[in-house]
């Protein structure tokens, strides 16, 4: 009977091992599956962010548009790596943990089989004890009962050895798989984050190089209704440049007016040769006028 009780304690240890594995591996599977799903949802949200960044960039000034598009492209690359992360987690971590349930079920079946053999041995021992108490002189019946007990003990011993091998193999495989699952998990995470850091570094540089002053100039120009940048200060020259004089000569009209003004001191635009050229921005285009004591005289073809 002591051997039977010893085997019973052994079985309880085996059952606890399997039950503990079933409990925690089930929780690992559930949590890692949830982790993978949340990672996939994070990828989806980031894809939406990429789309919004592109839409926003298309509505902005050129400098910001180029920066936002570059940033969106880098963010999209990170999501490609995240997609690979999700697929690898499912393949190398979650799915193997799901399949572990079948192995646990098989080990439980082996333990159940052993317990059946053990119970049979215990019953034969109990019958033998009762027979010895009721009919101590019936040696034939007692001998047959002892034979049955011996057979049950042999079956129980053989089954015990098989079960020990099964549970030992189960424990070894469990520890090996546990190591592999989490090594794969960490490797997948390291690969993703290494790639992500590389791409995010590029994204940071893209954002850091953004020249907001150029966009501010464009914005201020739009606020003033101007679609370019022109120098609105008076030119330093006291006489028109050759290109302007050539234009004046081709038109002819202003040249005559200037000549008359110089000949006639009473002419309203006479300034005795002291003329300066002003540059104005009119309706989005540069226009020139000659400035003197008499006021402003616009070039032909231009009007304020």
From Swiss-Prot:
The keyword Cytoplasm applies. Keywords: Cell projection, Cilium biogenesis/degradation, Cytoplasm, Cytoskeleton. Pfam families: FAM92. It comes from the Eukaryota. GO terms for cellular component: centriole; ciliary basal body; ciliary transition zone; cytoplasm. Restricted to certain tissues, most prominently expressed in multicilaited tissues. SUPFAM superfamilies: BAR/IMD domain-like. It is found in: Cytoplasm, Cytoskeleton, Microtubule organizing center, Centrosome, Centriole; Cytoplasm, Cytoskeleton, Cilium basal body. One of its GO terms (biological process) is cilium assembly. Residues 6-217 are annotated as: BAR-like. Its main location: cytoplasm. Changing residue 134 to E: Abolishes ability to induce membrane remodeling in the presence of CBY1. May play a role in ciliogenesis. In cooperation with CBY1 may facilitate ciliogenesis likely by the recruitment and fusion of endosomal vesicles at distal appendages during early stages of ciliogenesis. The BAR-like domain displays limited similarity to other BAR domains. Homodimer (via BAR-like domain). Heterodimer (via BAR-like domain) with FAM92A. Interacts with CBY1. Belongs to the CIBAR family. This is CBY1-interacting BAR domain-containing protein 2. The gene is CIBAR2.
């Amino acid at each position: 009977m002591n051997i039977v009780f010893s085997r019973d304690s052994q079985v309880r240890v085996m059952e606890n091992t399997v039950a503990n594995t079933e409990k925690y591996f089930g929780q690992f599977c559930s949590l890692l599956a949830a982790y993978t799903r949340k990672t996939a949802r994070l990828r989806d949200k980031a894809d939406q962010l990429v789309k919004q960044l592109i839409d926003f960039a298309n509505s902005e000034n050129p400098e910001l548009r180029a920066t936002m598009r570059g940033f969106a492209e880098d963010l999209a690359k990170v999501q490609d790596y995240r997609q690979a992360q999700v697929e690898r987690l499912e393949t190398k971590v979650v799915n193997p943990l799901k399949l572990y349930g079948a192995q646990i079920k098989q080990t439980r079946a082996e333990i159940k089989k052993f317990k059946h053999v053990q119970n049979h041995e215990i019953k034969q021992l109990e019958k033998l004890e009762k027979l010895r108490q009721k009919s101590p002189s019936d040696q034939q019946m007692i001998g047959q009962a002892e034979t049955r007990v011996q057979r049950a003990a042999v079956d129980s011993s053989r089954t015990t050895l098989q079960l020990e091998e099964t549970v030992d193999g189960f424990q070894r495989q469990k520890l090996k798989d546990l190591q592999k699952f989490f090594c794969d998990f960490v490797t997948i995470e390291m690969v993703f984050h290494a790639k992500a850091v590389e791409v995010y570094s590029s994204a940071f540089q893209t954002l850091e190089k953004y020249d907001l002053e150029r966009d501010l100039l464009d914005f201020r120009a739009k606020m003033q209704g101007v679609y370019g940048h022109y120098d609105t200060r008076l030119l330093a020259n006291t006489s028109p440049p050759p290109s302007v004089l050539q234009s004046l000569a081709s038109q002819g009209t202003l040249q005559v007016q200037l000549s008359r003004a110089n000949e006639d001191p009473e002419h309203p635009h006479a300034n005795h040769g002291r003329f300066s050229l002003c540059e104005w921005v009119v309706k989005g285009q540069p226009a020139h006028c000659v400035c003197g004591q008499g006021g402003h005289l616009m070039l032909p073809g231009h009007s304020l």
